[in-house]
């Protein structure tokens, strides 16, 4: 447990060392003031019960041992106070000192916690930022094997668990060891014999607590994994609610969610039961330890052979009892940390995931395209299945290539290899003779614009969706892009024009309007290469005409790779490639392929693109 905890600290704490130092300083001061305020109890007891009749004289430092000099001079000061002002005044003065030192102690404890809060909130922010940065950086292939809801659970639930367990326990993990060490030091000074006896008891209690803590981490990991499954279930239901209702599947999804939710309840019930065991177990072990020490110490005093007086023994027990609460908090914190470390393991599956699409160490600059694109014996696979198998293809500058074929033939994958959403496993793809793996991802993707089959829009204004990734665009450029995309008229008909919020994923717009905004965004970027996945969703005649006209405007003068679904787009392409099982089985113009009377003509007859 401690190894994982300190590994986590080394990863995230270094920027906040100053606050750690201040926290330690104030915790040390608080521990010292605690012990000193407790020490004032001894003369109060001796004065009340007349237990100390000795006469003290002032001792210089160095005239005897440090402990002996400090204790003697403290009693000398109390003695002078009694002689000058009487026992009642001396008692009031010592009691006032107790109040003052207690005030200083709690003030120091607050300042220690004050600095720790800065660390706690900052580290949680840093973890969230790192996860988000990693999500944005990781290749698309990583998320093909991950549930979207589970990724969201790690970003929300797991980070919250780290905050509520590890970071909330951070102050206890720094404060309690200092307090325990200070108390143990004082216990040794008061009675080393009694302290040796205590040391034989503490490891037994620690072993029992540690055994339960290890089991808690395993259960916590199961709980966080199941929470991810639950979020995935919710995300799928909300995203597919139209289908759920259309197929009268409400009872089916309710049962599926109820089963997952009950499973989560059982796991969390087990986890919380183990966690709640920490306090009563530490309470019982602490009380049992105190009882044994009381018996052993009392036996020494009653025997008359003890090196400790009755008031000193009471002070010793007060100090020892002061260890019990920090020890209980320490054990409770260790339980919480076990829960948090389980969440850290899940977070690290994202943070430590390998980014397989890497930039070259010395990237070749590529700011424009003059010659064209070339696929050379390209092969790519998902797992053990080759989905692109030995493709050779040349696309001249300014030309349009239409990829056609039945579902699963490899069209989308072939297009996704160009912007390096995935990397080829064999062969190469080059632009103007430069392998795209030798170009930085930023420069490569700056050459390309994407219009997806389903328009991907954000919960923001129309203007911000059009200028997404082109922040320097002027209002005139945005308006011009909207007009070319046939989107200007419907934009101006909305309540706030370009400043209208379109809702989550553009839910306030029609399907055709969403596609027109997506086209306007690509037009504003003005890339030399366009990757277009035509929408297959049915639009009304007017919207279909507007979208097709906008696409024609967008494709004009650009090198275009289009995953074609409309016969009109295919007919106008400079080259048509027919894919089947990851291979190009036919290529040519529309008229050439129709004349060959092969697979392409069969697809045209069936209208399956």
Give a label for each model feature.
Residues 1-39, 48-98, 104, 111-116, ...:
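Membrane-integrated ABC transporters
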Residues 2, 33-42, 50, 92-93, ...:
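Juxtamembrane helix-loop junctions of ABC transporter transmembrane domains
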Residues 12-18, 140-141, 157-166, 170, ...:
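An intracellular "coupling" helix at the cytosolic face of ABC transporter transmembrane type-1 domains
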Residues 19-29, 171-222, 295-308, 325:
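Transmembrane helices of ABC transporter permease
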Residues 30, 34, 101, 105-109, ...:
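Alpha-helical transmembrane segments of multipass membrane proteins
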Residues 135, 257, 347, 375:
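Conserved catalytic Walker-motif region of ABC-type ATPase nucleotide-binding domains
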Residues 186-200, 274-345, 350-351:
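Helix-loop-helix
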Residues 359-360, 366-609:
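ABC-type nucleotide-binding domain
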């Amino acid at each position: 447990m401690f190894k994982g905890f300190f590994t986590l600290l080394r990863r995230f704490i270094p920027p906040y060392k100053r606050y750690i130092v201040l926290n330690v300083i104030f915790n040390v001061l608080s521990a010292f003031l605690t012990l000193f305020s407790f020490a004032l109890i001894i003369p109060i007891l001796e004065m009340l019960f007349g237990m100390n009749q000795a006469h003290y004289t002032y001792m210089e430092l160095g005239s005897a041992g440090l402990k002996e000099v400090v204790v003697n001079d403290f009693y000398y000061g109390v003695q002078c106070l009694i002689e000058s002002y009487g026992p009642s005044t001396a008692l009031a003065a010592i009691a006032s000192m107790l109040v003052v030192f207690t005030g200083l102690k709690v003030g120091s404890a607050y300042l220690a916690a004050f600095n720790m809060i800065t660390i706690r909130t900052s580290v949680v922010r840093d973890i969230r930022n790192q996860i988000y940065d990693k999500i944005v950086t990781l290749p698309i292939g990583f998320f093909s094997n991950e549930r979207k809801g589970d990724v969201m659970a790690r970003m929300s639930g797991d980070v919250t668990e780290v905050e509520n367990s590890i970071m909330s326990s951070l102050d206890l993990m720094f404060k309690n060891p200092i307090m325990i060490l200070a108390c143990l030091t004082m216990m040794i000074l008061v009675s080393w014999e009694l302290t040796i006896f205590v040391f034989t008891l503490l490891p037994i209690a620690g072993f029992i607590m540690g055994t339960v803590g290890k089991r808690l981490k395993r259960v916590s990991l199961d709980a966080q994994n199941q929470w991810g499954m639950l979020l995935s279930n919710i995300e799928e239901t909300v995203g597919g609610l139209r289908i759920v209702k259309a197929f009268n599947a409400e009872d089916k999804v309710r049962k599926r969610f109820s089963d997952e939710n009950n499973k989560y309840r059982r796991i969390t019930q087990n986890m919380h039961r183990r966690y709640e065991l920490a306090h009563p177990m530490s309470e019982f072990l602490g009380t049992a330890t105190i009882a044994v020490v009381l018996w052993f110490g009392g036996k020494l005093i009653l025997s008359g052979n003890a090196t400790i007086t009755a008031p000193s023994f009471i002070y010793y027990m007060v100090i020892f009892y002061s260890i019990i609460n920090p020890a209980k908090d320490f054990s409770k914190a260790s339980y919480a940390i076990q829960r948090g470390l389980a969440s850290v393991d899940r977070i690290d599956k994202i943070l430590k995931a390998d980014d397989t699409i890497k930039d070259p160490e010395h990237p070749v600059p590529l700011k424009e395209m003059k010659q064209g694109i070339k696929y050379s014996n390209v092969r790519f696979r998902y797992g053990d299945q080759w989905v692109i198998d030995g493709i050779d293809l040349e696309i001249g500058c300014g030309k349009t290539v239409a990829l056609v074929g039945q579902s699963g033939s490899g069209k989308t994958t072939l297009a996704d290899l160009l912007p390096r959403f995935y990397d080829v496993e064999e062969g190469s793809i080059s632009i103007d003779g430069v392998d795209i793996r030798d170009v930085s991802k930023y420069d490569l993707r700056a050459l390309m614009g994407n219009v997806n089959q389903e328009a991907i829009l954000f919960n923001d204004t129309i203007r911000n969706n059009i200028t997404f990734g082109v922040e320097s665009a002027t209002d005139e450029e945005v308006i011009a892009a909207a007009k070319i995309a046939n989107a200007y008229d419907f934009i101006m008909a909305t309540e706030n024009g370009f400043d209208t919020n379109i809702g989550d994923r553009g839910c306030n717009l029609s399907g055709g309007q969403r596609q027109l905004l997506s086209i306007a965004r690509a037009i504003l970027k003005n890339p030399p290469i366009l990757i277009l996945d035509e929408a297959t969703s049915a639009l009304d005649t007017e919207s279909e005409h507007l979208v097709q006209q906008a696409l024609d405007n967008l494709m004009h003068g650009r090198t275009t790779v289009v995953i074609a679904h409309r016969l009109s787009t295919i007919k106008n392409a400079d080259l048509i490639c027919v894919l089947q099982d990851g291979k190009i089985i036919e290529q040519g113009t529309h008229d050439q392929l129709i004349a060959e009377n092969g697979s392409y003509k069969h697809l045209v007859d069936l209208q399956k693109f």
